[in-house]
């Protein structure tokens, strides 16, 4: 069976994602350091929170380079998806750079409603 690594980037939804996977019959291992990604066949990077603290925690735990070097499928959820890009307007922070581009703040305008995302 392929090992699924669930990366702990300090996001509030780690437990929820793990529970959802368990309900689907998928066993996931929570990873808190770069060594935990060595034998992973799939990676999920969940997250609810802010980009700057999440990237700081990934750096502190030695996860940035292993995530960048990963050759297996990687799914980013919410903040995790934002962290896959080169940078983010939220905290003006450099991210993982796995996807080209910058996560930008949605701009409202006349007749254009912007959903509340927590940092607008």
Q: Whereabouts are the PLM-identified features?
A:
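Short acidic low-complexity segments
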Residues: 29-39
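Cysteine-nucleophile active-site neighborhood
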Residues: 49-120
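Structural signature of beta-strand start/N-cap positions in the alpha/beta core
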Residues: 27, 42, 73-75
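Extreme N-terminal starter segment of soluble prokaryotic enzymes
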Residues: 1-5
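Divalent-cation-assisted or electrostatically stabilized phosphate/pyrophosphate-binding catalytic cores
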Residues: 17
């Amino acid at each position: 069976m392929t090992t699924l690594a669930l990366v702990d980037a300090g996001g509030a939804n780690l437990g929820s994602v793990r529970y959802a996977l368990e309900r689907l019959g998928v066993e996931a291992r929570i990873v808190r350091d770069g060594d935990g990604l060595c034998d992973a066949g799939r990676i999920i990077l969940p997250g609810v929170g802010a980009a700057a603290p999440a990237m700081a925690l990934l750096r502190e735990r030695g996860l940035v380079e292993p995530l960048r070097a990963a050759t297996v499928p990687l799914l980013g959820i919410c903040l995790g998806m934002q962290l896959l890009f080169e940078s983010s307007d939220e905290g003006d922070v450099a991210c993982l750079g796995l996807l080209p581009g910058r996560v930008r703040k949605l701009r409202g305008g006349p007749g254009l409603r912007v959903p509340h995302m927590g940092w607008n």
